[in-house]
Structures are given as structure tokens and as C-alpha cells.
Amino acid sequence: MVLIKVLANLLILQLSYAQKSSELIIGGDECNINEHRFLVALYTSRTLFCGGTLINQEWVLTAAHCNMEDIQIKLGMHSKKVPNEDEQKRVPKEKFFCLSSKNYTLWDKDIMLIRLDSPVKNSAHIAPLSLPSSPPSVGSVCRTMGWGRISSTKETYPDVPHCVNINLLEYEMCRAPYPEFELPATSRTLCAGILEGGKDTCVGDSGGPLICNGQFQGIASWGDDPCAQPHKPAAYTKVFDHLDWIENIIAGNTDASCPP
């Protein structure tokens, strides 16, 4: 059964699909402390519920279904228990969605741009990740990461982010297992995973990056639950297809429209 991988109050989608806002990495290893300077953690109260990506000193890109009230954003974090000296905290100044109705049930509009309340400073553990200069290719080896669940069946969450390498697959590989959802034949969504299973994002990883050949190509969006099942890869919002919208919003054109 597929369900939204966020918190219960995000089930406004009225779908039983696994949106990975609460997902973690399955089948990976602890990330090196120096390999995720762009990775941010989204908190509400004391709960880490999503990831995101710092794309410049003032903007974070994440999934639309990660939107919640009272979001706090931690940058430069590795261990949840032992803070880095250069960690910084911010809150959203503005949030922008590809659809004004925030109706990300269209599957390929699960993207949110957050303007921080003040710019961050680069440091040993904080630096932005550039937007992609070209689209990704099927067959690419991609890396994804997050503080999400590390067990597909148990509520086991790590202290530090986990990283895993997965493959970029044809979109149909994500569409075919779920005929009941009548997903569109084409989509601005990337499909990534390991067909034999065992490696995947999971609950708590939503909003985090998918990096293919060194470029930021995807935002963790939805997948099956339990995670990492054979022939059930996960879906990621395609960053490249939203470049014009992202760049227009950052430039101050808040009326910018999403790609059709």
C-alpha cells in the first residue's frame, strides 16, 4: 500500500501514495560530513520532517508537500545530537509554489521555493549547490541523501544523514506499478531507484536532492511504502524543467508561471 510519507496532517492530498517528506535512506551509508554542505533540514517544533537544498545564500528548494506552518531551517547540520560549530538557523521569509492552489496532486508540480529571512554565510559545512546546466540522462548513476528512515519496516531514524547511489530510470518504471492512480503518460518527474530493490529514499527524505553526474537534478517527491521494494522505484520532481520558474522567482518576478 502506498501512502504519503510526511506527517498525518499532510494527508490533504487525499491519496494513499508515499510522498517522501518523511522518508529516509534505505540501503545506504552515512554521508561524509563534507559531502552535503548544501543539504538543509526542515524542522517543525523539534521534529525533522523533510530535507531541502540550498541553491544560493538566500534560497532553498524543496518539495511542495513539505510545506508546514512554523518551519525552521537548519543549515550546516550533520549530527542531530552534536551540532557543528558553523550551523545556522533560518525561517522562511516567503514561500513560492508552482501552482497557486498548492495542488501538487498533479505529481509533477511537487516543488517549493523558500526565501530565507536572511542570507546565510558559506562555511566549512555550508555552501549552495548550483542548478543544473543540462537535463539528466536515463542510465545515470545518481546520489540522494537525507535523515529519513533507514528501515523499510521500522521507525528507525539515523543521527546523521545517509547517502545512497541509485540509477535514473525511464519514467514508465515509476508509472507502471500503479495503474490505479492513472498517472500521466508523460511527466516532469524523474524516476530513480534500483529495480531489484534494497536502495531507496524513505519517510523523512522528502524534499532532499537527487544529484546525477554532479548536477542537482531532482527533488525527492513520492514512492512506495514499504520503501525500497523491487520494481517500485521512487519519483523526483525534475529540477531542470522548472529552471525558468525558479530563476524568475529569484529575480523578483513573483507572477512567473510554471511549465505546462
Curated annotation (Swiss-Prot):
GO BP terms in the entry: proteolysis
Classification of source organism: Eukaryota, Metazoa, Chordata, Craniata, Vertebrata
Gene3D superfamilies (alphabetical): Trypsin-like serine proteases
Glycosylation (residues): N103
Subunit structure: Monomer.
Top-level class of the enzyme under EC nomenclature: hydrolase
Chain's gene name: JZTHR7
Keyword Repressor: no
Name recorded for this polypeptide: Snake venom serine protease pallabin-2
Principal location: secreted
Any single Gene Ontology cellular-component annotation: secretory granule
Compartment(s) of residence: Secreted
Signal sequence, start to end: 1-18
Gene Ontology terms for molecular function: serine-type endopeptidase activity; toxin activity
Domain Peptidase S1: 25-251
Tissues with expression: Expressed by the venom gland.
Pfam families: Trypsin
Positions of disulphide bridges: C31-C163, C50-C66, C98-C258, C142-C212, C174-C191, C202-C227
Annotated function: Snake venom serine protease that may act in the hemostasis system of the prey.
Source organism per UniProt: Gloydius halys (Chinese water mocassin)
Keywords, sorted A to Z: Disulfide bond, Glycoprotein, Hemostasis impairing toxin, Hydrolase, Protease, Secreted, Serine protease, Signal, Toxin, Zymogen
Annotated propeptide span(s): 19-24
E.C. no: 3.4.21.-
Active site: H65, D110, S206
